[in-house]
């Protein structure tokens, strides 16, 4: 755990929250103690934003539930949209060429039957077929998938229609780890952003995308505050950049050890209302 920067109470102006594993646990809902703590922080003038790997439409109910009053950061930061005006401040998809390359790799014989692959285009979910992994995902996300057989039919260079994010799912966590290592060997960070949001999700996005860069957009383009005036809370590898960015970066209690190591503070787990504990500790 990193030493906390000099950040007295009252200094934080922006609180950025991840969804899954942070404000929403197994129930897929935000528990009352967490809601009350968020509202108490807002009553003291703290602004609240959501930063998630979820689709925009899937994240919207959480944004509304916590009364977030800033544009919603979705798709690991690849999509930033105002929920009131619907103005999209930022959208950076993967190129058509790169998406096709990645699909070729993920559909190699040694991987194809062991993976579900999701393409997210214009806030719609496209899959080859609807199987167990995808059914579970659809249930939690609240988004019905579009089964298209061959995902290549979704890629249209003429329209520059390409995925905001690509997700490979497998219950075989060793396979997900293996894929992460192998794809990192094929592409430099300047070419592709790679992360895991949970142990069974391998995610690919444009290299100029991560939650840290998205929070920086809110901070500098919209709010004109400093990183030291930001507190971020997350639970997995896709949260690392925003935890490092903020004056106070909080990891959840059941985060991977590598994520806890870069945080300034470790909260209890999501099922123990860790976000409420963190807000009470630092903001109230």
Tell me what each language-model feature is.
Residues 4-14, 31, 203-284:
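Mg2+-dependent phosphoryl-transfer enzymes with acidic/Ser/Thr/Gly-rich catalytic loops
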Residues 11-27, 102:
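Asp-based phosphoryl-transfer active-site loop
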Residues 21, 54, 234-236:
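Active-site metal-binding loops of divalent metal-dependent hydrolases
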Residues 27-139:
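Active-site phosphate-binding/coordination module
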Residues 34, 59-63, 179, 183, ...:
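Hydrophobic packing residues within well-ordered alpha-helices of enzyme cores
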Residues 56-60, 176, 212, 239-240:
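Short, well-ordered alpha-helical microsegments
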Residues 66-68, 75-76, 190, 245-246, ...:
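Short, structured coil segments at secondary-structure junctions
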Residues 109, 113-233:
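Conserved acidic, metal-coordinating active-site core of Asp-based
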